[in-house]
A protein has these predicted regions:
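Extracellular, repeat-based ectodomains that mediate carbohydrate processing or recognition
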Residues: 1-202
């Protein structure tokens, strides 16, 4: 899976290639993003409990496309589910609720209940956030949202970048990210500047 600048004639697009258990190609490479305006890039993929998979990526100008197909916002986060045969399950969907600022650098992980969770870097400033925060959205096994999107980082001073996410046993998951916060009262603060922080969710 990766981004290509040659597929749809508009800019970067996200493509995938399935492989069998022996590492042999299963079918041809295929385009994942439905919307092709401007750039779709920086994909992340996770296998699901039912044998399918989900892909997420950042898409430029798609959040607020007007009637003429012209975008007015910057990057947003999108996703597409597939079944075990590599057939799309439903339509491409937007992940981020808030469209101001930029939503970039998505990461996705599967959950042991059949669902999945997506994290991303966000500059909307929602919930009193800083220049860049980390936000998340959970999904059920049928691709339905579970609750609202939420901010991951507790401290909002300075910047929080480049999330990664992993599903854990018992319906838990952990999000990690690069963090510039040097608050004196913050446990584990890396006073040298950037540090790596994490948060477990249940």
């Amino acid at each position: 899976m990766g981004s290509s600048s040659y597929g749809d004639g508009e800019g970067y697009s996200v493509y995938g290639q399935r492989f069998d258990v022996d590492g042999e190609q299963a079918g041809d490479a295929f385009q994942i993003n439905t919307e092709t305006y401007n750039n779709q890039q920086d994909p992340s993929i996770a296998s699901l409990q039912d044998g399918g998979f989900v892909v997420t990526w950042e898409s430029r100008y798609q959040d607020d496309l007007d009637a003429n197909g012209n975008g007015n916002s910057n990057y947003g986060i999108y996703g597409q589910r597939y079944d075990a045969n590599g057939t799309p399950s439903g339509s491409e969907f937007r992940v981020n609720t808030y469209t101001s600022g930029e939503q970039t650098h998505p990461a996705v992980a599967s959950m042991d209940d059949g669902g999945f969770v997506i994290a991303w870097q966000d500059s909307s400033g929602h919930d009193g956030g800083s220049s860049y925060d980390i936000r998340c959205q959970r999904y059920g096994s049928n691709g339905e949202t579970r609750g609202d999107e939420f901010m991951v980082n507790s401290y909002v001073s300075n910047d929080h970048h480049d999330p990664d996410i992993t599903g854990l046993d018992g319906g838990k998951f952990i999000v990690t990210w690069g963090d510039e916060t040097t608050h004196a009262n913050r446990p584990g603060t890396d006073t040298s500047g950037w540090g790596v922080f994490g948060q477990v969710f249940t």
